[in-house]
């Protein structure tokens, strides 16, 4: 099996790191209300000055995951955090993440195995148990 030159391996790591940084910055901007639409792979490729297919293939080769994996994991991280805030409705959370309510529920359940409402109830119950154990 041929061995890839070290320069090529380094470039794959650089592209992957730049992509993950761009995803994190983009989601921070969406969460901060500075942008109201989610980027697609073409948008990230344009930011990194490379072809979308090259970006996708490079990330997949370097990490074993498609680019959408990193994007979706970051969205799930934000969704979980927001669901712990009882003052936010699920509709508000969906809108903040640029989903409509039903698509957000499907998206969340695909990754978490429960609906956003069920997740919220489970974590509210575990918070109450923790408070009781600590005598608060």
Where are each of the predicted segments found?
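Basic, amphipathic alpha-helix used for nucleic-acid engagement in HTH/winged-helix/SANT-Myb modules
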Residues: 1-12, 56
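A short, Lys/Arg-enriched amphipathic alpha-helix from helix-turn-helix/homeodomain DNA-binding modules
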Residues: 10-48, 69-87
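Terminal helix-turn-helix DNA-binding modules in bacterial transcription factors
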Residues: 62-99, 122-136
């Amino acid at each position: 099996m041929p061995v890839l030159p070290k320069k090529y391996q380094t470039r794959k790591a650089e592209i992957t790191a730049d992509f993950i940084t761009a995803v994190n910055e983009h989601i921070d901007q969406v969460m901060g209300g500075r942008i109201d639409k989610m980027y697609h792979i073409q948008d990230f490729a344009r930011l990194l000055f490379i072809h979308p297919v090259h970006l996708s293939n490079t990330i997949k080769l370097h990490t074993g995951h498609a680019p959408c994996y990193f994007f979706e994991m970051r969205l799930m991280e934000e969704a979980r955090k927001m669901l712990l805030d009882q003052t936010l409705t699920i509709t508000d959370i969906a809108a903040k993440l640029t989903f409509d309510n039903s698509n957000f529920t499907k998206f969340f359940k695909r990754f978490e195995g429960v609906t956003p409402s069920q997740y919220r109830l489970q974590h509210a119950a575990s918070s109450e148990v923790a408070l009781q154990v600590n005598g608060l």
